[in-house]
Structure formats: C-alpha cells, structure tokens
Amino acid sequence: MEDLQLVLFVLGAIAIVAVLVHGFWSIRRQQPKSLKDSPMGNFYKKQAERGEGAPKRVDADGFDADGIGAVRVRKANEAHTPEAPAFNPYLKQEAKTQPQPVEPVQVEPKPLFEQEPSMAQPDFSLQSPTAKEQHRGPKASRQEPVLQGHSANLAQAHVGQSHAAMVAQKVAEEQRAQVQMPTQTALFDDEEPYEEEQSQAVEQADDDLGEPRDVLVLHVVAKEGQQLNGAELLPCFLTLNFKYGDMNIFHRHVDNAGNGKVLFSIANMVKPGIFDPDNMEQFSTQGVVFFMTLPCYGDALMNFSIMLNSARQLADDIDAVVLDGQRQPWGEFTKQDYLHRIRANA
C-alpha cells in the first residue's frame, strides 16, 4: 500500500512539472521574436562587412543596386527655390498678351422726339384720354357724418324728479348731438350720378331725431335690507347684450354685438350714476335704472318691450324688484301709461 502511494506521488510531481514546462513554452512561442533572434537581424551587418573592400556600383543618378543614394544634409532655414518646369516640346505654349484698357465710349443722349424748328414748344404734353384717367388718381370717397360736439345745455329737471331721470336726460342729450354732413366739392367733372344718390341716402338715414321729448324709466332695486353686488351685475349685463361705453354706463345697441345706434341704457341709481368695470367686485348699490329716450331709433314700442324684458330678466337673476319711474311697483296701469307716452311721441 505504501509503495502505491509513493508511485502516485511521483507521477503527480512529474505531471505538474510537465504542465509548467508546457506553459512556459507556449508563452515564449506566442511572444514576437526580437530583432536579435530574427534570421534577418544581422543581414545588413554581414552585408556591410562583406562589401567594405569592394566598390559600390552607382548609376548615373547616384543610386546603388538597392536604390540607396548618397546622404544629403539640408539646413532647416534654407529657402526652398522652386524648380523651373522642364520644357516639353510636345506642348506649344502660346504667349499671353495682357489686354489693354479700352476707353469708354461716351454716347450723347438723343431726344426721343425731334421737334421741328418752326413748331413752338407747348407748355403741356398731349396725352390720350386713357393716360388722363391714369394720372388723375383715385376719387375721394364720401366722408362719414362727423359729430360736431355734444350739446352742453341740459334740460332743467322737474321738481321731484329722481336722480335716475336726471342721468337719463343727460345721456339723451349726449346721444342727440347735432349731426351734419360736410359738403364736399367734386374733384372732377365726370362725377357719377349714383354717388350723389348714395350721399342722399346716407343723409336721410342719419337725420337728427331732434331734442328728446320724454324719457321712459324703469328701476331694478334690491329688496329691503339688501344690496346689489357688482360681481353679480356685470355678468348679467353682458348676458343681456349691454356694452360699456359713453358716460361710463352700459348701453344696449341695435346690434347684439354692441354696434349701431343706442336703444336704451343702464345707469347706477346712486350718485354719480356711473360704473367701474375694473372694480365691480368691490362695488355694491341699492339699484340700477333702465331709461330710453323718445323719440328713438327704430320701433319705439319694440325697443321698450326689449327694455322691459331685460329689466325683468335682471330682477329674476339677482332676486330684485322692478319699479317704474316713480319707484312704484310695476303694474298694468303703469304699463298702459307707458304705451300711451310711446304713441304720443312716435
């Protein structure tokens, strides 16, 4: 048993040594051979030793059999002089002549139309009718009516008239400013007839309605012990197609978009009777007043119907009460009185 162990120990040692030797041999074989061990390492040295006494064969250009010539040393600061190109007899080079500057030729301008000596020079040029039309320029269009100014004299308020009626009277005076059509002289003799017809139509459409003879007033007031908040009034005004404008109050125009003539307006019932849209959230009042002047633009009965419906709609939205011009509850008797006043001033 001991002999078997000894044999195995020896075999293991031999195997280990064999593996180590094989590893070193593989590593050395994979490494590149140095210049010293390479077969071409001493090639140039031996060749030089053999040819020391023998003369080297050099061709006409100074190169030996291996293509090596004499070593030439050049200075670093030596200027490089370009060599002249060799002459090629097969290429014919033509001498280039520099073009001489040519003096500019002065051409005298000639008149487009030669005039005869006997004919006098006219002061104006003759042109065709078409040319006249082109030089005439655009015709001036009719100007829109210009508001001359607002009347400064307000009608005296009646005794006992409320502040809302006074505001309505003032706004009515502003809306009934005198409208005049400026007269414009014709620039040309061939003015078209249809332009005159259009001018007359505009003048008839913009005729002044005259001084207001009556004012229809409706109040929308808060219930007892309450007030109307500006944060609630502003969206209601916009929903009813009112637009903030002149006199710092809201107006209802012919067009729902806020264009055209003013039909009726809304003012603050408390002095000074104006609104500030930028501070409506901090604004509160006891009520607002609707007013319409007579005569008015369009159908007065239809305009009053729109104003009455707007007042009722506003009262329903903000939980308020509709009153007449004397701040009395709106009823059938008051309605008939307003209709009679509308017919009287139609």
From Swiss-Prot:
Residues 76-103, 121-145 are annotated as: Disordered. Pfam families: ZipA_C. SUPFAM superfamilies: Cell-division protein ZipA, C-terminal domain. The keyword Cell inner membrane applies. Residues 28-346 are cytoplasmic. Residues 1-6 are periplasmic. Keywords: Cell cycle, Cell division, Cell inner membrane, Cell membrane, Membrane, Transmembrane, Transmembrane helix. The chain crosses the membrane at residues 7-27. SMART domains: ZipA_C. GO terms for cellular component: cell division site; plasma membrane. One of its GO terms (biological process) is division septum assembly. Its main location: membrane. Essential cell division protein that stabilizes the FtsZ protofilaments by cross-linking them and that serves as a cytoplasmic membrane anchor for the Z ring. Also required for the recruitment to the septal ring of downstream cell division proteins. This is Cell division protein ZipA. It comes from Shewanella sp. (strain MR-7).
